[in-house]
Amino acid sequence: MNGPATEKKMGEIFDLQHFCLDDGPGIRTTVFLKGCPLRCIWCHNPESYEKRDTISYNESKCSGCGACVEVCPQKAHRIVTGLHRFEREACTRCGACTEVCCYGALKKIGRTVTAEEVIAEVKKDRTFYEKPGPGGITISGGEPLFQPYFLRELLQAAKDEGIHTCLETSGFCAAEPLNAVIPLTDLFLFDLKGERAAYPHLTGVRAEEIYQNLEILLEKKCHVVIRVPLIPGINDTETFFGELAKLYRRQ
């Protein structure tokens, strides 16, 4: 699985967090890749939807000063009766508004990086990976497999440095990119969102491909931890618990 040379070299991330304790064993450095095909109704990272960079707007921080209105070449920002209106359809993501917003209401989300740049940042935490161990890099998103070529290059760079690798995934992808990263991934954190029949309502996608990919990992004896964002009244159903019990008995 080779892919375009440009896509192999560059990727889009929207965050890199140090000293993470909930994204796999030990102390982790978590890299968040942009782009996700799911639209989970409880999503707390909507800025990760698009693979390209985006402009986020936090209304609660806006003072209505109008600085963004003055610099936006597309007139995507307007002040109407003292309130800020952001027309996303007109926005070309030039970022001019974020540079003049002194209240932090407008921010540019996402940056283009190489695998080497990411690993250079990850290596700064190497001392913390050794004790208590086995810490390392966790690649999250978004959906990391939405950038398959960059993901593989990033995992390979980590393995070349002897760094433990962990991939957090929804499992929604073709089988080929998943199979390509299996030899490079020490641990899969596989997120299941709810019972199979409820997937279209909960996430906007069907569950068949997701469970087929989970089956691939289980059959190949990969190290898999199934994780669930348990939300009362939404996905805490007896049917879902029954499906999970069957899967856990296989591990």
Predicted features and spans:
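Fold-independent oxyanion-binding glycine-rich loops
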Residues: 16, 34, 46, 88-89, ...
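N-terminal pre-core extensions flanking Radical SAM catalytic domains
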Residues: 1-12, 30-31
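N-terminal pre-triad scaffold of radical SAM enzymes
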Residues: 14-67, 84-93
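Conserved AdoMet/S-adenosylmethionine-binding subsite of the radical SAM
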Residues: 116-251
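Hydrophobic packing within well-folded, soluble alpha/beta domains
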Residues: 40, 62, 68, 72, ...
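Short gly/ser/thr-rich secondary-structure transition/capping motifs
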Residues: 12-14, 80, 168-172
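N-terminal-biased segments
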Residues: 24-25, 32, 49-50, 54-59, ...
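Iron-sulfur cluster-binding cysteine motifs and their immediate structural context
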Residues: 41-48, 67-86, 96-111
